[in-house]
């Protein structure tokens, strides 16, 4: 892939060199210094570009082992630092040192599911020195936990699937499924990259099959699971930036199998749901939600919440007001949403892979069609 990388990078640099002098530089009356983590990720680069285009100074950080990330060389980056992994004891002090040295005004974590916890922990350490666009530990644990998230939403009168906390396989075996209109699925509450895609429907055909299935899962009080209604329908994913309960920036797109393609999909019902949820919890930070519009009743249900940056933020690549959404403490007159002129975003290698596999599939289907038309020998 090196030749392709080199060719694409060279073309992009050439275009940038030609067009850069003609681009209007935005000025701000109050320039800030912004610290962004997760430097190797595309969403971190997108945020860096948005802040830089708005006239702010951008500091990018990443773990030591990713010191050579190409993003450090972006024109949007003023300084680059490496820090220990988020779970390392020295991580909080490393971030604090950068905040103090660079006089950082706002810290915007761009983190993984695991790292989001440590950025919530470090919030209390950084808060006396800068604003932190991340939820606190208590809120993070409440939102990350699929069951407590569903319980909170339901208490606010917001629509979620029927959900049950499971700490012992016997709870599922003894559950009375009679009279339930929908099947159920069971998911690990702690993040499980392997089993998260298992959508086995419960109950199984027999009690014995149900028992065999749930007894094979690592369910315990220490590792609880959630049994939730299975709702077939159109799935949506979102990214929202919230300050003191005000929804400042929001985007929504249809979910896909690999979730590497993003095209804006206007869903006012989802926006209203998130606005209510954010206000009730007085959230500050970045949150992303998964929703599904049910095939059977056409209603919109929130499935889960991930309190961190979503890659759908890339849909704001040409929006001039992203920085305002992150920096303004007061509610904006209108929510920042992808421009009508913005095109869908995608990842080049995935498009190449899809092009190749689609062609293979077409050839196989063509061959199968040809064979099916061939006369059988007598």
How would you describe each model-predicted region?
Residues 1-134:
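ATP-binding N-terminal substructure of ATP-dependent carboxylate-amine bond-forming enzymes
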Residues 140-225, 243-246, 268-272:
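Active-site nucleotide/adenylate-binding loops and adjacent lid/helix of ATP-dependent enzymes
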Residues 184, 248, 299-304, 370:
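Protein kinase-like catalytic core scaffold
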Residues 204-273, 292-301:
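Phosphate-binding site of ATP-dependent enzymes
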Residues 226, 286-288, 335-341:
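Flexible, glycine/charged-enriched surface loops at secondary-structure junctions
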Residues 240, 279-315:
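Conserved metal-phosphate-binding beta-hairpin within the catalytic cores
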Residues 324-363, 378:
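Peripheral (often C-terminal) accessory segments that flank ATP-dependent C-N-forming ligase machineries
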Residues 364-377:
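Positively charged, low-complexity/disordered segments
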């Amino acid at each position: 892939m090196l030749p392709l990388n080199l060719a694409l990078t060279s073309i992009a640099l050439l275009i940038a060199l030609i067009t850069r002098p003609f681009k209007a530089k935005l000025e701000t009356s109050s320039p800030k210094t912004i610290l962004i983590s997760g430097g190797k990720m595309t969403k971190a680069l997108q945020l860096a570009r948005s802040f830089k285009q708005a006239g702010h100074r951008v500091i990018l950080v990443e773990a030591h082992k990713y010191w050579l990330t190409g993003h450090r060389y972006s024109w949007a980056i003023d300084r680059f630092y490496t820090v220990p992994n988020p779970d390392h004891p020295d991580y909080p002090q490393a971030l604090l040192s950068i905040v103090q040295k660079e006089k950082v005004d706002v810290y915007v974590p761009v983190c993984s599911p695991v790292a989001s916890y440590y950025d919530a922990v470090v919030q209390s350490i950084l808060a006396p020195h800068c604003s932190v666009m991340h939820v606190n530990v208590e809120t993070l644990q409440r939102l990350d936990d699929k069951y407590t998230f569903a319980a909170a939403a339901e208490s606010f009168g917001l629509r979620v699937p029927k959900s049950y906390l499971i700490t012992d396989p016997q709870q599922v075996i003894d559950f009375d499924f009679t009279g339930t209109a929908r099947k159920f699925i069971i998911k690990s509450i702690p993040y499980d990259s392997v089993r998260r895609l298992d959508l086995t429907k419960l109950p199984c055909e027999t009690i014995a099959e149900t028992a065999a299935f749930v007894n094979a899962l690592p369910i315990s009080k220490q590792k609880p699971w959630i049994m939730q209604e299975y709702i077939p329908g159109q799935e949506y994913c979102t990214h929202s930036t919230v300050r003191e309960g005000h929804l400042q920036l929001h985007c929504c797109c249809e979910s896909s199998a690999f979730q590497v393609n993003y095209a804006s999909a206007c869903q006012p019902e989802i926006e209203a749901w998130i606005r209510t949820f954010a206000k009730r919890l007085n959230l500050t930070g970045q949150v992303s939600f998964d929703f599904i519009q049910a095939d059977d009743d056409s209603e919109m249900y929130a499935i889960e919440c991930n309190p961190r940056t979503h890659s759908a933020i890339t849909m704001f690549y040409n929006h001039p007001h992203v920085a305002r959404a992150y920096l303004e403490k007061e509610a904006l007159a209108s929510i920042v949403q992808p421009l009508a002129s913005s095109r869908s975003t995608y990842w080049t290698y995935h498009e190449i892979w899809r092009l190749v596999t689609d062609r293979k599939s077409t050839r196989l289907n063509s061959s199968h069609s040809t064979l099916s038309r061939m006369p059988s020998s007598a």
